[in-house]
Amino acid sequence: MTGESLQICSPIPGRVVGLSQVPDLVFSGMIVGAGVAVKPNPGATKITAVSPVSGRLIKLFPHAFMVSSGEQIVLVHLGVDTVKMRGEGFTCHAVENEKLNVGDPVTTFSVTQIEKAKHSSLCPVVVLDSTPEDLENLTSEGIQVDMGDLLFEIFDLSSDTSSE
């Protein structure tokens, strides 16, 4: 493989879960891209999600954010169907177009409010338009991770597809 490797780190502490277990076909079917999900630790009430890569915050919603790093865009979704909460239980600490480093705080969210609203607290972390074959060094399901721990790597293959 040629190209540079981008490390995608965990935005929250928790347990790694396969995307196939996310109760939303957009993620479980890898329609938006490949990656993993992180299940918040039992008993967690509020968590501050951090940037999984260094880059530019290109989209920020209370329940989700996207960070662009090189040719890749990483989507972090805080819970499933949490768009229906209309921002309740979420506090944003960053602004769109802000330059972020790995570990910079982006959004604090209430796991308690997500679960009270009967939504899944699983947090998918995906690289948009990627496939499982694009990912390397994938952290195994069931592994406990802290914020900033490696989830997986993806290689920038843009130089391989330069003919247009």
Question: Language-model segments: which ranges?
Answer:
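Contiguous, well-folded functional domains in the mature portion of proteins
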Residues: 1-164
